[in-house]
Each structure stands twice: as C-alpha cells, then as structure tokens.
A protein has these predicted regions:
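Asp-based phosphoryl-transfer active-site loop
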Residues: 1-14, 34, 201
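Substrate-recognition element of Asp-dependent hydrolases with the DxDx(T/V) motif
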Residues: 24-46, 58, 103-116, 158-162, ...
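Conserved acidic, metal-coordinating active-site core of Asp-based
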Residues: 99-189
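Mg2+-dependent phosphoryl-transfer enzymes with acidic/Ser/Thr/Gly-rich catalytic loops
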Residues: 15-16, 169-236
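Active-site phosphate-binding/coordination module
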Residues: 14-104
C-alpha cells in the first residue's frame, strides 16, 4: 500500500523511469494499492497509465474517489462550509509568503486541498515555499488552528499534505477510511512520507501499526525504491 507524492514520486513530479519499471514488475507479483490525496488525473500524470492499471485499486482523494483499472467504483461528494473556507481565505491573504501563484483552493471528491503558494506555482516558487514553511511552520500552524476552531463544530479535520498543501476532509474520511476494505488481509505493508502527527499519512499509519501491520515512514521515493529492492533481494 503506497502513498504517491514523496513516496513513489518527487512532490507533484513524475515517477523515475527505472523505478517505474521496477515497480511495474513488483505490481505483477503483489497485491498493490495506492492511496493518495491527489485526484485521478494528477495520479495518472505522476505514475503513468500502466502503473495505475497494474494496481488492484487506486484510492484517490484520500479514499473519497476510488478506481479499479480506470473504472470508478466509489465517489464521496462533500463541500467545505463557508466559515472554515473564509478562515483559509484570511490566512492566504495575510500570509507572510509573498508569492501567490493562483489555484489556492482545489476542490476534489470528498476533500479540499489548500495551498498558500498555489498549485500554479513554478518549481522555483515551490522550492521557495518549502524553505519558508520549513522555517515558519506555516502549514502546521494553519492546520492546528483550523482543527481547534472548526474540527468539532463542523466534523472536519485538516492535515499537512505533500510539500505545499493542506488536506481538509470530514472526520473519518482521511486515508484510514480505506482500511475497511482490507479486513481479510493478514499482512499489510504501508509506505508513506507524511506519517508524522499532523501529516496526511498519520491516521492510516497509526491504524495499521495498531493492528500489527508494517509501516515504512520514508524520506522520499529513493527510500521506497531502496526498501523494495532489499525486500526483493531477501525473497529471492
């Protein structure tokens, strides 16, 4: 079971060619699932049609938009209420980060992705924001304040996602919701780069650890590739 951004690919980038070939062969001999906050079109852009089809199931939008071989099997429709939306607008307008590239609110099935720098940012603007956020912890601050102000009242939760985003869903509609489909699996191995508290892999990682499964909190896709290669060598 794999996250995409920062786990199989560089953030918002495409899968490495050599890793892609290795991962396709891995998919042929294992039950492989993807669970990502990104929508279907972005996931296909990142991993490619062949990998997308080779997975037994892809859980897009944190499990709120689900596909098997490009056929949609489930979609959760949801819209963020006005008050928390206005809070995010206010944080955007008063952010100390000067570069606002546009497309700051990305509504996806069952979730909203919010970004201060914006999804239209250039690669350099993304790097600049990563440095800014690493120092100022802006996304962590927004997410924590958001959850305190709106979490219980609106039954919603916010988590830090990817390098520049914040994912907002209804409570119980994060990535951990997909585990209801895996009750018959005796062994699950999960790979994710945002397994820390406040990250959008945290809830599913903690649920799996609590059930006796294995979680690899990876640093990047190179780390994932290394671990999978070592697992393959051990099994042969």
């Amino acid at each position: 079971m794999f996250d995409v951004d920062g786990t199989l690919t560089p953030s918002r980038g495409k899968m490495d060619f050599t890793f892609n070939k290795f991962f396709y062969d891995f998919c042929l001999i294992n039950d492989v699932y993807i669970v990502t906050g990104s929508d279907q079109s972005k996931t296909v852009e990142q991993v490619g049609n062949i990998i997308y089809s080779a997975c037994k199931r892809v859980y897009n939008c944190s499990g709120n938009d689900v596909y098997e071989n490009f056929e949609n099997v489930y979609t959760n429709k949801w819209t963020l209420a006005e008050a928390p939306w206005k809070y995010l607008e206010n944080r955007l307008n008063h952010s100390g980060f000067p570069q606002k590239a546009g497309w700051h609110f990305d509504e996806r099935p069952g979730m909203l992705n919010f970004s201060i720098v914006g999804r239209k940012c250039t690669a350099q603007q993304r790097k600049d924001y990563v440095l800014y956020d690493t120092y100022h912890k802006e996304r962590e601050d927004i997410s924590n304040e958001f959850n305190t102000a709106f979490g219980d009242k609106y039954n919603i939760m916010s988590t830090v996602a990817g390098e520049t985003g914040i994912d907002i869903t209804e409570k119980g509609r994060g990535k951990a919701q997909i585990l209801k489909d895996f009750l018959d699996y005796e062994e699950i191995i999960f790979f994710g780069d945002k397994c820390m508290k406040g990250g959008n892999d945290h809830d599913i990682a903690q649920s799996l650890i609590g059930s006796g499964h294995t979680v690899f909190a990876v640093k990047d896709w190179h780390d994932t590739y290394r671990i999978l290669s070592e697992m393959h060598e051990t099994s042969t």
